[in-house]
Amino acid sequence: MGAQINSAANPKTSGLDVDGFDAFCDHLLVRESTSHQVIGTYRILSPHKAFEAGGYYSAGEFDISRLAHLSSSMVELGRACVHQDYRHGGTITMLWAGLAKYMQTHNYEYMIGCASVPMQDGGHMAASLYHQLKDTHLSPAEYRVFPHNPLPIDALNKDLPVICPPLIKGYLRLGAYICGAPAWDAAFNTADMLVLLPLSKINSRYAAHFLK
């Protein structure tokens, strides 16, 4: 889906998580009120900037052609990060409120992003999590995506008891879909699931808070 973007810096050697999409993105920050230290971040790739960048980051991991009809109003979220001392809920709530305002200001309707599950166990937890979620949170077929490098789910244990990672749980509570089977991101040793959240599907309990 467009030109390949090369990494601008090697995270393993620079200590920085940087790639070629960063320059095309808007960056949402939460700062601590006294020290002004950055304690929470999201990066946002808007539709017109995705076109300039040669496509969405997610297209490097998935065939997202079934989402093409959404692209004029679809933003991609990435690099969600909250400082370890501020992971009590307030910071992510502020980030989500900022995202909601961004979406409403620019009249965008859909958010997508790759939600990552660590694979230190070889992928069994990720396979079990997908198996657990697919019956209740899988997207309609018209929003389905297909991994270029699929996690080999059938070769893994799909029946382990798992706890859903907090960020994925938060997206699902808002009303997000899982758009298909996980991709294996060998560079970061994670299993990535493509998440889609239409603003129109946000749970009414949260819509009153975020969509004012």
Language model feature labels by segment:
Residues 59-60, 208-212:
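Short intrinsically disordered coil segments
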Residues 47-177, 182-192:
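Acyl-donor binding region in acyl/amide transferases
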Residues 1-43:
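Active-site rim helix/loop that mediates acceptor-substrate recognition in acyltransferases
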Residues 33-35, 85-86, 199-202:
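Short loop segments at secondary-structure junctions
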Residues 201, 207-208:
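Long, contiguous binding/interaction regions
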Residues 188-202:
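C-terminal "cap" of GNAT-fold acetyltransferases
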